[in-house]
Amino acid sequence: MEILACLEKSFVQISDLIRKTNSVNLGNLVDTHNASGDDVKTIDVMSNDIMKDNLSKCALIRTIGSEEEDEFYSTKFTDAPYLICYDPLDGSSNIDVNITTGTIFSVYEYDANNKIADGHSIVMSGYCLYGGATQYVLAYNNKISFYQYSAEDGLFQLLNDNLKMKEKGAIYSLNESNKKAWTDARFNQLIETFIEQKYTTRWGGKFSCRRAQNADQGWVFCLSRQPQGHRRQDSLAI
């Protein structure tokens, strides 16, 4: 699929950028905030430029939406069937301390009235991780596939064409520093039950990393309701 080829090209370029550039420089703040209210770093801008440049050349993409831009971008392909939305570098706040980062994306199909009705319009979504390896997970055509980049041949290799989450794990993931804001006693009891059953807690603030850990190890992920909470990333990749 042409869209996937453009995404893969972007993933490799962002991975190379992270690996080959001074991470302190990449972590420098730019004097602006993005659409989610986050501070913007140099790596955010550069990653967004990579994604936008590659995807705007794809004849299947009509519109591009990025967390780093306030407005949607219309490509020259005005009759193309798809809108793509992405966070070009989830976890950029950790770039200068060498913690795994990622790209989150979702592709929507316009209906007969040239509208995106709701989440049911999603035809493909996933995320790419930039860490010890460059890997991406793709939800498409009623299955989830897992790929890893091979620098030796310059291609992404399929590792698992039917990725499934474990039915039960032994880890739960949430930010317990927000405990005083929890208002539902049932949620507090749920966490106490996890502790009694000797679950281990893990928490990383970035969705792409959390989602990868949850899928691989069968974690329970909890996102408590917060007025300042970043629900955008999680909603995007569902």
Give the location of each predicted region.
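An extended, acidic
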Residues: L4-L7, F11-I14, I18, H33, ...
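N-terminal glycine-rich anion-binding loops that anchor highly charged ligand groups
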Residues: D16-N28
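Short, basic, glycine/proline-bearing loop/turn elements
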Residues: N34-D39, A59, G102-V107, D111, ...
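Catalytic-loop motifs flanking and including active-site residues across diverse enzymes
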Residues: S47, I99-T100, F207
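Buried hydrophobic packing segments
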Residues: M51, L55, T103-V107, R211
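N-terminal assembly/interaction segments in proteins that build large macromolecular machines
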Residues: G27-I84
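DPxDG-like acidic metal-binding loop motif
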Residues: A80-K143
